C-alpha cells in the first residue's frame, strides 16, 4: 500500500505478534507536572539496578518516562502485562531493542525455538559488542508476580554490565534483590519518594487556577497525603465544582477510594 504524502515510512520492521506501543517510551499525560527534581533517584551508572515500587497511581511510569525521553536513543523500554507468556515477552524484548538498534538479533526469527534465558544471554552479548551503555526499563503491570521470581532471577543473571536496569512494579519481590545487588548498585524508590510535596501541590493548583491558599481547599488536597493520582483527581473535581472535597470522609466510606473518586470525576465529564 502506497504511503500518503507526508506519512512517515517505518524505519524498521515490527517483530511478528508484537504491539509496538508496548516497546516504546510512553507519552506523558496532559497537564503533567514535571518531576525533574526526582531524576537523581534514577541516575545510576552501569551496571546498576533501580527498583520503583508503589501502588497504582503514584506516577512511577510517568516519572521514568520523563527521565527516559531525555535520552531515548539509549533506552530499551518494555511493558509487560498479566497475559504475556515467556514467548510474548521474548518478542517484545527483541523489538524494544530493535527500536534503537535496527536489525538487532537477526537470529530471533530464524531460530524460533531458542529458550528465553538463552535469548537474554545472546541479547546481552550483542549489546556488549556495541561498546555503548544502555538503559533497560521494564514496566511490570503484572499483579501475580510470585510465579515470576525464579525466571526473573535467571534472566537478570544474564544482563550485561553495560546495562542500567530500571524495573517498575506494584509489589516487592525481595527474594530477587540479592541477584540484583550482584550486578552492582541497587536503589529502591518507594511511595515516600514518589508522593507529591507541598510545593508540587501548590504548583498543580496554580496550573488549574485553584487558590491553594484557601484553607479548605488546601486541607482537601493535603488529605490525599501526596498520592499523585488522588491529588490529580481532586484537583480536577475542585476546578470543576469550585469547592473542596472531603477526601478523608471518602477514604473512610469506601473500600476503594481512588476508584470512587475516579467514578465521580468521570460523572462530571458528562455534565
Segments predicted by a language model, with ranges:
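Conserved adenine-nucleotide phosphate-binding loops and their immediately adjacent elements
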Residues: 2-42, 108, 203
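Loop-to-helix "switch" segment enriched in basic
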Residues: 127, 171, 181-182, 186-191, ...
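Conserved P-loop NTPase "ATPase switch" module shared by AAA+ and STAND
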Residues: 123-148
Amino acid at each position: 500500500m502506497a504511503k500518503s504524502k507526508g506519512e512517515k515510512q517505518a524505519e524498521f520492521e515490527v517483530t511478528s505478534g508484537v504491539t509496538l506501543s508496548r516497546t516504546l517510551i510512553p507519552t506523558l499525560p496532559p497537564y503533567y507536572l514535571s518531576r525533574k527534581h526526582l531524576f537523581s533517584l534514577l541516575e545510576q551508572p552501569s551496571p546498576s539496578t533501580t527498583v520503583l515500587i508503589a501502588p497504582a497511581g503514584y506516577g512511577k511510569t510517568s516519572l521514568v518516562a520523563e527521565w527516559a525521553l531525555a535520552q531515548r536513543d539509549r533506552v530499551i523500554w518494555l511493558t509487560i502485562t498479566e497475559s504475556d507468556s515467556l514467548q510474548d515477552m521474548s518478542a517484545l524484548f527483541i523489538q524494544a531493542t530493535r527500536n534503537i538498534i535496527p536489525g538487532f538479533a537477526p537470529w530471533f526469527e530464524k531460530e524460533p525455538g531458542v529458550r528465553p534465558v538463552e535469548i537474554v544471554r545472546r541479547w546481552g552479548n550483542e549489546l556488549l559488542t556495541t561498546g555503548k551503555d544502555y538503559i533497560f526499563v521494564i514496566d511490570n503491570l503484572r499483579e501475580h508476580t510470585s510465579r515470576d521470581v525464579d525466571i526473573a532471577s535467571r534472566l537478570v543473571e544474564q544482563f550485561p554490565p553495560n546495562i542500567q536496569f530500571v524495573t517498575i512494579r506494584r509489589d516487592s519481590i525481595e527474594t530477587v534483590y540479592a541477584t540484583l545487588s550482584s550486578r552492582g548498585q541497587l536503589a529502591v524508590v518507594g511511595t515516600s519518594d514518589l508522593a507529591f510535596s507541598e510545593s508540587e501541590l501548590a504548583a498543580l493548583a496554580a496550573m488549574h487556577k485553584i487558590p491553594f491558599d484557601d484553607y479548605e481547599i488546601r486541607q482537601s488536597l493535603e488529605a490525599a497525603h501526596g498520592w499523585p493520582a488522588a491529588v490529580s483527581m481532586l484537583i480536577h473535581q475542585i476546578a470543576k465544582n469550585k469547592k473542596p472535597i472531603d477526601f478523608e470522609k471518602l477514604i473512610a466510606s469506601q473500600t476503594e477510594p481512588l476508584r470512587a473518586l475516579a467514578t465521580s470525576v468521570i460523572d462530571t465529564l458528562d455534565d
